[in-house]
Structure formats: structure tokens, C-alpha cells
Amino acid sequence: MRLYRVTHAALVGVGIALLLSARLANQDWWDRHFLPIFALRRETLLIAEQTVRVVMALAGAALALVLARPIAGVLSRATLAGMLRILLALLLALGASEVALRARPPHPHDADSLQLEPRRQPDPRLGWVFVPARSVLALEAGRRVSYSFDASGHRVPSPGATVDADRPSVLFTGESIVAGYGLDWQNTIPARVSALLGMQSVIMAVSDYSNDQSYLRLAAELPRFRQPVAVVTLFMPSLFDRNLLGNRPHLDTGLVWRPAVQPWRLVQLFHWLIPYRSSAAIERSVQGTRETLCALVDLARSRGAEALIVVPQFEPESATDEMLRRRILDEPNLPYVQVKLDPSWHLPDDRHPDERGAKAIAAAVARAIPPHLLLPPRRCPAL
């Protein structure tokens, strides 16, 4: 009888805790601990968050008022041997799940498989790069898209095309938006900037990169180019969560390179399902992202190139979006251009910019690059 009372009280306590959690987890709490997600509209996230609160409240009420008694009755009659068998079965199930998840090729849980087109291959320092010297016609967002890459893994206009490292160039580093996911070459942001400025654009961007990886890619490639005119990268609050992940190569305080750390796959899956971030973790990533972007700007300027950070915006800026932009870009006075886009300017059933979105971003980039940088160097007249 005593075991029943203790179990019943514990279950009622859990139910009350769920009710209190649902009450305390207001919108401000959600905004502080669950970051924007690129693939989802904010209104979808708000609905999901409110649904979770309602489910927690209903579950807590049901447990405290209805289910606590029958569950306590069952548990109080259970034998030690029976409970051990259940525990063993649970551990075996978790172990089997971990083995099954590890059978898949490892890649960050927030990134696509490296085998999806355009294919990527592992890289010990960057995490992954596009497979070099390759062309493919892929089906992306319901359309056929041609991708071609040179021997260095830069996206190029056509098979066999190469990048001339001696020419004046605008260098683009970033992720799939910069790389032109779902767009043929001529419609990508770099290609449109090239057409507007009459200057070679070089795409160093690789799908699913964080800001750390984008910087590392630039640092590795920049020494090859003799006349870098500008370096363009991307920052989006809805992609900021990637910068918190240690399961890809990343930069620690002081720009110290760290290899990827692969935790238990079940833990990764749990974090993917419930992407809760502590205030301390977010603050560390704000500081780290700011340090990385400052280093990128300094690196570009050390070669006489202009640096520009592009901030595309599909939806009205939320309080979290504004906080991240202010803390990461405004406070250190980094050079950036915010590009507000029509919410409909994205690929079908996909959040990447379509031709209209890419055109608007490219126009903003071209306007932001100082005209004097586009002039050919003057030669001294012969004496």
C-alpha cells in the first residue's frame, strides 16, 4: 500500500510539473531557446510551439487527474524481476537503434546526405566539399538543374569551364543559397553579379556550410587569387543554429580549428527532434559567429578586397532575428546589406530563393560594392 501511495504521488507530481511547464513556456521562452529554422515559416513554428504547450497541459491534467491511479496500481504490483526485464528490453532496443543509425554514412543531422545531388565528398578540414571535375543534371524542387564543378570544386557555368585565378574576381563563400541550389548557373546570385559588374565571380560556397566552414573555405582558397576585388558571404538568423553544432569541423574561441565530434546517434536524433538551446550555448555561438565573420572581413581586406555580408529576409524580422543581426553584425560594425524579399520568391515547395529572389540579392550585392574597386588598375605613363 505504501508503494502505491508513493507511486501515485510521484505520478501526480509529474502531471503537475507538465501543467506548470506548459504555463511557464510562453512565447518569450520559446524564442529564447528555440532558434529560427530555415526550412519552416515562422507561423508554422508558432503553431507547433502552441500545439506542444497544449499537449503538455492536456497530458499533465490527464496524468494528475485520471491516469495516476491506474498506472500506480499497475506499477505497485510489478515484481522486481518484471521491471528488470522491461529495463533490459528497453536497453536492447536503444542499442539496436543506435547500431541501425550508425549503419548510415555519418553526416550532420541537419545536413543532407552527401550522396544527394550535387554530390559532396568528405574533407578532413572542411567537413565536405563538392565532388570536383563533375557535371550532373539533377532534379531539384521539381525542376531539372545543371550543375558543373571544376577541379577545385567551384561551381562553373558548364562542363570543362575553369576559374581564372589571375583575373579580377568577386569571391562568394557560403552555403546552398550562395551556391545556387535549384538554379541553373545563369540565374545564380554570383552569375548575376558577374553580369552586372562585368567581372568574374567565383563560387566557393558548398551546401550546408556553417559560417565557420565558409570562413575556412575562403582562407584555404584566397591565396590562389591574384586580384580579389570583393568577398561576399551570407548570414541568416534561420541558419544560425548550424553554428552551434560541434558535429562538423568548427572554430573554437580564438579561431582555433576543432574536428567534428560525433556524439551518440540517438542523442543527435533527439536534438533534431527537440532543438532546445540553452542561453549560454546561444551566447557562445553569438560570440563565435561574430569572431568568425570579423576574421573573414579582415582576411578579405588584407588582400585589398571589399567584404560584404548578405542578409536575405523572406519574412518580417522577428525579435530573435533582430537580436542576432544586432549582436553579430551591428555591434562590431560589420559591412552587410539586408535584402528584403517577397515571401513568394522561393522555389516550389522549398525555401531557397528562386530566380526572382536571386536577382534581387544580386542587385543588392552589385550596388554595395564600391565602384572604384571595379576600375582596372592604372598604369603610370611612360616617361
Describe the residue ranges of each PLM region.
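Conserved SGNH/GDSL esterase-like catalytic core that processes O-acyl groups on lipids
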Residues: V170, A179-V256
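Histidine-centered active-site loop/cap adjacent to the catalytic His
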Residues: M1, V6, D349-L383
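Serine-dependent acyl-ester chemistry module
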Residues: Y4, L11-R53, P70, L234-L329, ...
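Cytosolic-side transmembrane helix boundary signature
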Residues: R53-L87
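Internal/C-terminal transmembrane anchor helices
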Residues: R77-A103
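Membrane/wall-proximal cationic-aromatic binding patches
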Residues: A103-L196, S344-H346, L383
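Short, amphipathic alpha-helical "lid/cap" segments that border enzyme active or binding sites
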Residues: N211, Y215, V286, R290, ...
